[in-house]
Amino acid sequence: MRKLGIIAVLSLLVTAFAAVPALAVTNFDNAPSGAHYRTGSAEPVCTLSGLTVTCTGTTIGGVGNTNATVNLAVTSTFTGTCTNRGGHLVEPFTESETTTTTSVITSTRNGQLIVPEQSATGTSSEEFLATFECPNPNWTATISGTSISFLYTLTFAGFTEPAITISGP
């Protein structure tokens, strides 16, 4: 029962982090010459709601026949302790799990890259506890903190660095 209360509080804390703005950088030096956001389009905006990160779509013009790869990685980091049967804390832990979605976007006939909305969901406390094992099977794991972070990148074929990078929170 205590574990469920802690999980509920941690879920609220994760939601509170959603108000933190993401850091976005567009560098069209890492794109085909002439690449630009099409009129009416802008840099994608990523938002965190609960465990899910959603990044808006965009359209990039002037890319010729160059395709791009979009990655969205959501990392859930859990801190906590393992407790023995006597109630003593015996082993602290910090573990991270990353969920990644990858899409290859093909340029259109007129040299535009239409990037759809991207979404990925991090690992919940319940999912983490279902698979995490303390070093001793007789110990019980308790989560005391959770954080969510994400990294969105759009990298053009033939380039080693992303043209768009968004990280948060």
Predicted regions mapped to residue ranges:
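C-terminal segment of classical bacterial N-terminal signal peptides
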Residues: 14-23
